[in-house]
């Protein structure tokens, strides 16, 4: 298998560039620790209370409703109540198998 001189040169240049980028990231991390990390930025963001309240409401609905008697009991998460279970409408082969199982 023969490689041209140009392809070997390009591979070498790209490898060196990758090592330089990784070195810069590592250097930044060693200097600043987690303070420069994206996870640290997300942790410091204020909590959106409206979103948290909506999620808490859905969670309460799911916990309080073990079975369903109508589509309203599914807390708006799945479209239909089938045989006492909130079942999503899935198309294709998987939907057919789920439909027969329920």
Curated annotation (Swiss-Prot):
Q: Where, by tissue, is this protein expressed?
A: Expressed by the venom gland.
A single MF term (Gene Ontology): toxin activity
Please report the propeptide residues according to the UniProt annotation: 24-56, 100-102
> A single GO CC term, please?
extracellular region
Which key words tag this protein in UniProt? Amidation, Calcium channel impairing toxin, Disulfide bond, Ion channel impairing toxin, Knottin, Neurotoxin, Secreted, Signal, Toxin, Voltage-gated calcium channel impairing toxin
Subcellular location per UniProt equals:
Secreted
Signal peptide segment: 1-23
Positions of modified residues (Leucine amide): 98
Query: What are the disulfide bonds?
Result: 61-75, 68-81, 74-86
Family label: Belongs to the neurotoxin 15 family. 02 (omega-actx) subfamily.
As for what it does, the entry says: Potent inhibitor of insect, but not mammalian, voltage-gated calcium channels (Cav).
Quoted from the entry, the domain comment is: The presence of a 'disulfide through disulfide knot' structurally defines this protein as a knottin.
Which protein are we looking at? Omega-hexatoxin-Hi2a
Taxonomic lineage from the root: Eukaryota, Metazoa, Ecdysozoa, Arthropoda, Chelicerata
């Amino acid at each position: 298998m023969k490689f041209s001189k140009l392809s070997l040169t390009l591979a070498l240049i790209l490898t060196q560039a990758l090592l330089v980028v990784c070195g810069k990231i590592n250097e930044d991390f060693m200097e600043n620790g987690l303070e420069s990390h994206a996870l640290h930025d997300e942790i410091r963001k204020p909590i959106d209370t409206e979103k948290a309240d909506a999620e808490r409401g859905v969670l309460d609905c799911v916990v309080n409703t073990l079975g369903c008697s109508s589509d309203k009991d599914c807390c708006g998460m799945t479209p239909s109540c089938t045989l006492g279970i909130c079942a999503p409408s899935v198309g294709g082969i998987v939907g057919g198998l789920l439909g027969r199982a329920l």
